[in-house]
């Protein structure tokens, strides 16, 4: 009877696609007796776990969510006026429900395949247009990670672009303190001297300048003359700014800024204890080819119709590697989409109205605190006031706490207050009465009808140019309009809610609804990253427990959850290695060995950390070439800092010699960085911290179920062994500053990075338990081997382990087809769209191949559907091989086929329309139609347009 009363966890079979019966069939197909037997063939015995994970067992969804709700309740939701780059905002409910909570948006991958990504590309183009418009600059990228890292990227962009030969980057002391700290961290590995000072005292000789507009503590300054002075000495002017303020302020591009950066957080994205939020960067046209991050551009498709794509990809790490403009890979696409849609929803008039209201409320507050006898130190302001509270400061802060209000504590005698769009007249009265109480005075009754505050914007800083002039920002008149616009965009895209996304090295697994629910709870969403510690106990418990679980899973001793992408985790790990060597007096250790097959972020991150990259060859089996490794270690001698490897390898196999590789590097005085991108093949099976690695980053947006969001958000924790723990990223205090004892600076603007989505992996781990996590790994490996076995007859599987097995992904070699009849991996990738599939990873890690990772979440029926599609495509290739179809005019070369193509009055192709549209009978049920034909990449780069086209272009 007692068992009947127990809550039952049925999550594991809902997360894992194949049933136990299907698993048995699949094991029989690949010739293996059990999952345990499969692991024995795949995972080298020397690295396999000898004991199960010391984690609790699986639990039910109601139990886990109830516990998390109790944890969240330990956070205190105060009224926040801290500002400092983070502001209260209203997420439009139509965007909350139909974008943030919609798997059609949050389960998509980065739009590298533009033909099936036109919806989110259009939404990102809206975002880029919005940012470029508000900043008054020529071009904007499609998001960066946060304001602090965007400022750091601005510094490196300025270094690449400036005429000045100086190594000094001047940072205004009026910038947000967390931005200053992140910039300082980034500069350390790049031989850049950061000088923080007061720009009103004149500029030193420098290659770049970073200003804050408006100031962190509220002031608004006309920087036109300063920009002219900087340009006169060959320096680049960067400006960290506030998009809402720019609805009223002269845009930076008009007063001389070359680069503008910031965060779009206050455009509809809650605090989330620091993230995720979309950073932005805009710049002058002359800088576009040096700009970091992804860039959406307008091109045309094979039919001559407008089509969107990621432009100028040769700047990026996946192509340029250590010569890339940045190591950024995952950005903040989902949040950028939300911010762009916030602008579409409100339109130019609505945005001005919000900005004017915020500014007016700040003026009302200024009048009343001055009437109380306090001094407001900034005469100019947009939304923030610096108030000298003198000896009354402790009493004011006590009164604020009693009223559940957070003020920004600047120093012993001053506080700052930032107004946002959520502030009401009642809120304003409560805020004013906090100051009255602190001064021992009676409450004031606010009469909104009689208020007439003076404007706080000085001459020369008031915007005269229009905002959001493109028709898209005036097209939505009702929620019905918005709802249909969002549906139209979503219908253009292919995400996990439609079909599997078999991208190798990307781990596109289920993002379960139960995992997503907590991120919108107010107790998590409405916590400011610099709120006092006694208000964030729930978050701290979440962080501690998730950190402990991840350390148990990986075998490391300590972890930082601060990095807000995998690339940032890599960077943080390499900074830890750098700090460790320098603390030991081994400053000469600055060479990072990286296999030729490594992810592009690896060499890009090494370069940012101040290391030189030396490439190690791979052997014919896809493993690290031990002879070449030995030679390179001898060649670099005592300059060896680290080896970066991915495990299992990017070739989709567990290298048998990984422990020997680690031992050789350690013997030479180096450290081993193991890229955790493929951790989905090791959870519960092997612990990198126990078989020789010193540091790894994890991708919580891969292995631990944070959704990819169409290209972000992500979380890339960095886990280390004990000797590297002192060199993990520094955690900023409540003032946004780095404590003196920190050995390494922060890599993200918020103390715990994108803390607002950490509940997702916590829920996943809790629901799966130790046994479920291991089973997920086993089935991920089973699914990959099933696909490899079934397709090996049709496409060569390029690499396999000692027993002929792959790990959690497999590489299909398309090069023989390219050589014999000109059919490329790209042709097959585009043809898969006609079958309703996103392509596997193309040409990585080997050019001319397709890398398939099915993950554990795909069931046998979906695997068979993909396999059937690949077999059918191979039959179409055979038609070309036999001469039955033309080498240029065939279903592969012309793929994907749009409805417009197939409904044209004339059909000039040698194959029938039926074959183009419905190559398999199953496609007649729920056919996905690509909205555009194959996109012309070269045309888009030659004719770069990165803002919304006039509406006539789509007619």
From Swiss-Prot:
<dbReference type="GO" id="GO:0030170">
    <property type="term" value="F:pyridoxal phosphate binding"/>
</dbReference>
<dbReference type="GO" id="GO:0005829">
    <property type="term" value="C:cytosol"/>
</dbReference>
<dbReference type="InterPro" id="IPR003437">
    <property type="entry name" value="GcvP"/>
</dbReference>
<keyword id="KW-0560">Oxidoreductase</keyword>
<keyword id="KW-0663">Pyridoxal phosphate</keyword>
<dbReference type="GO" id="GO:0016594">
    <property type="term" value="F:glycine binding"/>
</dbReference>
<dbReference type="InterPro" id="IPR015422">
    <property type="entry name" value="PyrdxlP-dep_Trfase_small"/>
</dbReference>
<protein>
    <recommendedName>
        <fullName>Glycine dehydrogenase (decarboxylating)</fullName>
        <ecNumber>1.4.4.2</ecNumber>
    </recommendedName>
</protein>
<dbReference type="InterPro" id="IPR020581">
    <property type="entry name" value="GDC_P"/>
</dbReference>
<dbReference type="Pfam" id="PF02347">
    <property type="entry name" value="GDC-P"/>
</dbReference>
<dbReference type="InterPro" id="IPR015421">
    <property type="entry name" value="PyrdxlP-dep_Trfase_major"/>
</dbReference>
<dbReference type="GO" id="GO:0004375">
    <property type="term" value="F:glycine dehydrogenase (decarboxylating) activity"/>
</dbReference>
<dbReference type="InterPro" id="IPR049315">
    <property type="entry name" value="GDC-P_N"/>
</dbReference>
<dbReference type="InterPro" id="IPR049316">
    <property type="entry name" value="GDC-P_C"/>
</dbReference>
<comment type="function">
    <text>The glycine cleavage system catalyzes the degradation of glycine. The P protein binds the alpha-amino group of glycine through its pyridoxal phosphate cofactor; CO(2) is released and the remaining methylamine moiety is then transferred to the lipoamide cofactor of the H protein.</text>
</comment>
<dbReference type="GO" id="GO:0005960">
    <property type="term" value="C:glycine cleavage complex"/>
</dbReference>
<dbReference type="Pfam" id="PF21478">
    <property type="entry name" value="GcvP2_C"/>
</dbReference>
<dbReference type="InterPro" id="IPR015424">
    <property type="entry name" value="PyrdxlP-dep_Trfase"/>
</dbReference>
<feature type="modified residue" description="N6-(pyridoxal phosphate)lysine">
    <location>
        <position position="702"/>
    </location>
</feature>
<comment type="similarity">
    <text>Belongs to the GcvP family.</text>
</comment>
<comment type="subunit">
    <text>The glycine cleavage system is composed of four proteins: P, T, L and H.</text>
</comment>
<dbReference type="GO" id="GO:0019464">
    <property type="term" value="P:glycine decarboxylation via glycine cleavage system"/>
</dbReference>
């Amino acid at each position: 009877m007692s068992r009947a009363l127990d809550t039952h966890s049925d999550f594991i079979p809902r997360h894992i696609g194949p049933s136990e019966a299907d698993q048995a069939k699949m094991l029989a197909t690949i010739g293996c007796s059990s999952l345990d037997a499969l692991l024995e063939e795949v995972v080298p015995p020397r690295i396999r776990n000898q004991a199960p994970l010391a984690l609790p067992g699986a639990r039910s969804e109601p139990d886990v969510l109830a516990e998390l709700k109790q944890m969240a309740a330990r956070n205190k939701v105060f009224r926040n006026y801290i500002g400092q780059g983070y502001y209260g905002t209203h997420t439009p409910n139509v965007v909350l429900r139909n974008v943030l909570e919609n798997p059609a948006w949050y389960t998509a991958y980065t739009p590298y395949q533009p033909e099936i990504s036109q919806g989110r590309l259009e939404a990102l183009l809206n975002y880029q247009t919005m940012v470029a418009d508000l900043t008054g600059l020529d071009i904007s990228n499609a998001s960066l990670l946060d304001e602090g890292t965007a400022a750091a990227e601005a510094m490196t962009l300025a270094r690449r672009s400036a005429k000045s030969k100086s190594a000094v980057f001047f940072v205004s002391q009026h910038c947000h303190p967390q931005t200053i700290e992140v910039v300082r961290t980034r500069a350390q590995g790049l031989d850049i001297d950061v000088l923080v000072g007061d720009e009103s005292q004149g500029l030193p000789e420098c290659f770049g300048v970073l200003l804050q507009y408006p100031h962190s503590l509220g002031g608004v300054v006309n920087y036109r003359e300063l920009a002219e002075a900087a340009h006169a000495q060959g320096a680049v002017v960067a400006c960290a700014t506030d998009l809402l303020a720019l609805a009223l302020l002269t845009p930076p591009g008009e007063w001389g800024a070359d680069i503008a950066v910031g965060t779009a957080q206050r455009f509809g994205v809650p605090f989330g204890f620091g993230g995720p939020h979309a950073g932005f960067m805009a710049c002058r046209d002359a800088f576009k080819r040096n700009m970091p991050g992804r860039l959406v551009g307008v091109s045309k498709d094979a039919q001559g119709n407008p089509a969107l794509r990621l432009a100028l990809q040769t700047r990026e790490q996946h192509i340029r590697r250590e010569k890339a403009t940045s190591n950024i890979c995952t950005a903040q696409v989902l949040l950028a989409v939300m911010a762009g849609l916030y602008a579409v929803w409100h339109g130019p008039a609505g945005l001005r109205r919000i900005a004017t209201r915020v500014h007016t409320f700040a003026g009302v507050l200024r009048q009343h605190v001055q009437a109380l006898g306090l001094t407001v130190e900034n005469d100019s302001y947009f939304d923030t006031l610096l108030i000298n509270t003198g000896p009354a400061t402790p009493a004011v802060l006590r009164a604020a706490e009693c009223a559940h209000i957070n003020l920004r504590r600047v120093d012993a005698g001053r506080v700052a207050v930032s107004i946002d769009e959520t502030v009401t007249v009642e809120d304003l009265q409560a805020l004013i009465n906090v100051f009255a109480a602190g001064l021992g005075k009676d409450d004031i009754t606010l009469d909104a009808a009689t208020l007439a505050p003076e404007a706080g914007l000085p001459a020369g800083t008031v915007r005269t140019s229009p905002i959001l002039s493109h028709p898209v920002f005036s097209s939505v008149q009702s929620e019905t309009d918005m709802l249909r616009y969002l549906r139209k965009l979503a219908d253009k895209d292919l995400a996990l809610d439609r079909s599997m996304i078999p991208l190798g090295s990307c781990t596109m697994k289920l993002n379960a609804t139960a995992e997503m629910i907590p991120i919108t709870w107010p107790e998590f969403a409405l916590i400011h990253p610099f709120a006092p510690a006694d208000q964030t106990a729930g978050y701290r418990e979440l962080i501690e427990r998730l950190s402990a679980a991840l350390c148990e899973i990986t075998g490391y001793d300590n972890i930082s959850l601060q990095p807000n992408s995998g690339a940032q985790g890599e960077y943080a790990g390499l900074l830890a290695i750098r700090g460790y060597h320098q603390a030991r007096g081994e400053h000469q250790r600055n060479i990072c060995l990286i296999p030729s097959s490594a992810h592009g972020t690896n060499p890009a991150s090494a370069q940012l950390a101040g290391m030189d990259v030396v490439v190690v060859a791979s052997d014919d089996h896809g493993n690290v070439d031990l002879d070449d490794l030995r030679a390179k270690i001898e060649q670099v001698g005592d300059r060896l800092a680290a080896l970066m490897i991915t495990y299992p390898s990017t070739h989709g196999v567990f290298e048998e010699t990984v422990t020997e590789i680690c031992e050789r590097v350690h013997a030479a005085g180096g450290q081993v960085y193991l890229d955790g991108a493929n951790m989905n093949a090791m959870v519960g099976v092997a612990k990198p911290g126990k078989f020789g690695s010193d540091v790894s980053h994890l991708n919580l947006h891969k292995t631990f179920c944070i959704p990819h969001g169409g290209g972000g958000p992500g979380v890339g924790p960095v886990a280390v062994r004990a000797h590297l723990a002192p060199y993990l990223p520094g955690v900023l205090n409540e003032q946004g500053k780095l404590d003196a004892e920190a050995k390494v600076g922060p890599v993200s603007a918020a103390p715990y990075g994108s803390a607002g989505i950490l509940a997702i992996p916590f829920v996943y781990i809790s629901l799966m338990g130790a046994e479920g996590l291991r089973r997920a790994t086993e089935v991920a490996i089973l699914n990959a081997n099933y696909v490899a076995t079934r397709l090996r007859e049709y496409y060569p599987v390029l690499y396999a382990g000692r027993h002929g097995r792959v790990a959690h992904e497999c590489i299909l070699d398309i090069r023989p087809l390219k050589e014999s009849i000109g059919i490329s991996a790209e042709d097959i990738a585009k043809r898969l769209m006609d079958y309703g599939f996103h392509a596997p990873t193309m040409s990585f890690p080997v050019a001319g191949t397709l890398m398939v990772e099915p993950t554990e979440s795909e069931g046998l029926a979906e695997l068979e559907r993909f396999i059937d599609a690949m077999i059918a495509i191979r039959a179409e290739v055979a038609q070309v091989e036999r001469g039955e179809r033309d080498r240029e005019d065939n279903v592969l070369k012309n793929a994907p086929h749009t409805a417009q193509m197939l409904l044209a009055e004339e059909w000039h192709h040698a194959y029938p329309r039926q074959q183009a549209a419905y190559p398999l009978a199953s496609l007649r049920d729920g056919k996905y139609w690509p909205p555009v034909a194959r996109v012309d990449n070269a045309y888009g780069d030659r004719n770069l347009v990165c803002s919304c086209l006039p509406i006539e272009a789509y007619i």
